[in-house]
């Protein structure tokens, strides 16, 4: 009898360690937490940062034709103060303005300065041609100590027109220029406001002065306003510079009788460029396409948290210092306490295998030849193909060429400047929200996709095995026939033929099912066995007492 019991127990143990195949997914000991649309702090196996925070503290010019204007202001390249003599004509795809740069020598200002600056930043440089103006009966060599070369001089691209002699009358004049080129000409002229009426009379004669400028799209008259002003560069007078873009074949006509600063050459834009205001040094050994006042951002990420005022091919500025994009599946580190046989994990969706390093999804098996682990490349590749390129798609959605508007505005332009700054701040808020939403949506899709591929793989195996195996609720299938390594490989690569093993599986299932108990039934039997044992011990004790009393070996006295 004892021998039969031992044999039965041995059979059960051998069968319990029978052939088995389990499905699982990759896991790591320490994952990365990301946010989705519905949850925050979900741990995933892999994640990629989408916000760039690293900055190169130099303007990277490798592969570019930079122009460092130094002490020359960008607008000065149009009119030619002494500090801009070497930049009257230039070609560039990266224009760097410095804090020390100055547009003028004789005090004054440009109208619509910021708009003109933006045009020049994207100009690709400028070249010029003579407007062909000739004069008689007046002087064209006006000079000032404020614009010094070897001595007193003036703007290289402008003519300061004066009466033929002090206090002499200035004749009425008309000069015209037709744009012969196929692209717009940038025309700049000036109106001189003398430091006093006496000075104006000395320079241009007595009487009221009027300057009129006309083209097919532009008509404007100007009257100088002589008067005392604080001295700048030793001058109390001022020159206001005005400008227009003259269309091809269009003609601009100047009519004047004094106080007119005449253009000598028309400027033409060469192509396209980027312009940046910065005081950091240049570095020709490094390349980049995103620039700001503090240097260069070299990044392939869709967002950056370095500077909101940038130019070039720029990642969108967001306020968040980090937005992690999930590029791997949900991670639940392997818990040894939940292991079944040979490391099978209870709940294959809820737990992972840390050893599965060559794929996202895979198999572990046990058979007479031993144990093994293998990745499932088909399901892994299916998931990776859909997730690869997420970063590129985000970049496509977010990157665009930006222009920098970051200058001091004149009083008249201040309201426009306030609107620009308010708009910039509002756009930053909107894009910070959009960025978080975009990343959360992509993360939700990645996690759902990874879980879906796991379910597809599980269903694929279940449909192959059919009645030849039984699910055990832990992501494993207990196989009712002998399954060697070749058999296991056929399950993995979806070539398993269940009819080949049907008879053997049916026979083994009949032998195993009668003694197979679920964990719930085991608990019931355990308690039943405990109760039966107690009852048996009590019955034996009562029987012994009864025999002893009957034989006179024990006496029971009942007292009332």
Curated annotation (Swiss-Prot):
Disulfide bonds join 22-476, 72-84, 105-147, 483-487. Keywords: Clathrin- and caveolin-independent endocytosis of virus by host, Clathrin-mediated endocytosis of virus by host, Disulfide bond, Fusion of virus membrane with host endosomal membrane, Fusion of virus membrane with host membrane, Glycoprotein, Hemagglutinin, Host cell membrane, Host membrane, Host-virus interaction, Lipoprotein, Membrane, Palmitate, Signal, Transmembrane, Transmembrane helix, Viral attachment to host cell, Viral envelope protein, Viral penetration into host cytoplasm, Virion, Virus endocytosis by host, Virus entry into host cell. One of its GO terms (molecular function) is host cell surface receptor binding. One of its GO terms (biological process) is fusion of virus membrane with host endosome membrane. GO terms for cellular component: host cell plasma membrane; membrane; viral envelope; virion membrane. Binds to sialic acid-containing receptors on the cell surface, bringing about the attachment of the virus particle to the cell. This attachment induces virion internalization of about two third of the virus particles through clathrin-dependent endocytosis and about one third through a clathrin- and caveolin-independent pathway. Plays a major role in the determination of host range restriction and virulence. Class I viral fusion protein. Binds to sialic acid-containing receptors on the cell surface, bringing about the attachment of the virus particle to the cell. This attachment induces virion internalization either through clathrin-dependent endocytosis or through clathrin- and caveolin-independent pathway. Plays a major role in the determination of host range restriction and virulence. Class I viral fusion protein. Responsible for penetration of the virus into the cell cytoplasm by mediating the fusion of the membrane of the endocytosed virus particle with the endosomal membrane. This is Hemagglutinin.
